[in-house]
Amino acid sequence: MEEMRHAGQISRKLLFYFGSDNYNLSINDSMFRNCTLRADRAAALFGTMLEGVFLGIVLTMMGFFSVKTRFTPSSNIWLFAGCVAIALWLMTKMAQDYAPGPLKCIVTENLALFCSLLGGALNVGMCVDRCRAVYSRMARGSMTPAAICTYIFWAVVGSLLVIAVNALEMSRNGLHMSEGLEGGCFQAASPLAHRAKLVAKFLMYLVFVCIVSVGTALTLVKILNTNLNRKRAICVNVVLVTLPNTFIWLTAMTSAWREFSSYKMCPKIVTGNVFIYLSSVPMLVILFVYMFTGKNLKHTLRPQTRSYSSSTGSASCFAHLAGKP
């Protein structure tokens, strides 16, 4: 009862003055003080147009993977699922600019979290698939389409469970419904929960980085121990595939650590900031890098795979991962 009364006081005391540089959070907690307002309302229209262009690119790629290639090779299933996650993320960010109502933050922030979790799981799955293929003695050592779809299904289920718990926590005391939060969303219902989520976010991305780093290192070791003539070029392409994801995760870890160390709990700017609209660029770069390196690997391996037996060498596995049916 005491906690509910305190939560109600927080909700009533939260004030926001338009035209100022800071949120005026009249709450007796140092974590709420000196929160800077960085929203630029003039950027919303530009951002929506930019996100519309990005969404068109992603939808075109989805059509290419599904209609043009018919998900052949099976690695295109990974890329199609990644496109779906990015498309949903873009539509979520567009909705954050215009969606009304007190539940906007609960719905859109958890959809964005879902896309982030699913995207990370997909990239980890692709890395494991790639590593598994190069260490297999079979010509088709990569995951089957059924196995990939099963992995994606459980990744979706796991991500949904996480955002369900997060949504319940965010909405438990009404802080998300405070007046005047246009342009910002609280990520938690209390300072303690906020710090716990930052730690969880840091650890989650750390796990992603560790799995992908180990998987990539094992893949590179295996490639370098083969008799392929252009194995160094293949290794460069494999590294290029993993670098964008690793950079994004390391950036997210740094951001979470800095926010945790600041002892602040400020509303997260979700609209009216040009950097938010440009944040989808790295994800598009990742997709193009996958497509480019796959094509590059295919041309690199084509003249070499004919001289290897599919039962004794891994060259066929490399070619399959590169996009060769």
UniProtKB/Swiss-Prot annotation:
Protein species of origin: Equine herpesvirus 2 (strain 86/87)
Cellular component aspect of the GO annotation: host cell membrane; membrane
Compartment list: Host membrane
Record lineage: Viruses, Duplodnaviria, Heunggongvirae, Peploviricota, Herviviricetes
Gene3D superfamilies for this protein: Rhodopsin 7-helix transmembrane proteins
Domain of life (superkingdom): Viruses
Protein name: G-protein coupled receptor E6
GO molecular function, one term: G protein-coupled receptor activity
Membrane topology: Multi-pass membrane protein
Predominant location category: host cell
